[in-house]
């Protein structure tokens, strides 16, 4: 499908996948790996978008991005939401 897979990172560092079966479910890095690997197997050209809260630590985003790359995600985007003043 042409819809990107969205990985949300909250400012607390918790990670969520925006897919119907996992909505609102906090994932460990292992769970993230398993789920994303399955989706990439089904669709190797899947675009993955990391959506980080404005206050999320940059290192956390980099860790997730590196994980996605190691799983074979080729097309990774990044959206950051600015914290509200």
Positions of PLM-derived features:
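Long, low-hydrophobicity, acidic/polar, solvent-exposed interaction domains
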Residues: 1-85
């Amino acid at each position: 499908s042409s819809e990107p897979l969205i990985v949300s990172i909250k400012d607390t560092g918790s990670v969520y996948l925006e897919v119907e079966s996992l909505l609102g479910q906090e994932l460990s890095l292992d769970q993230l790996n398993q789920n994303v690997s399955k989706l990439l197997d089904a669709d190797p050209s899947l675009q993955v978008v990391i959506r980080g809260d404005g206050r999320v630590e940059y290192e956390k985003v980099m860790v997730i991005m590196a994980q996605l790359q190691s799983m074979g995600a080729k097309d990774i985007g990044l959206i950051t939401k600015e914290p509200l003043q």
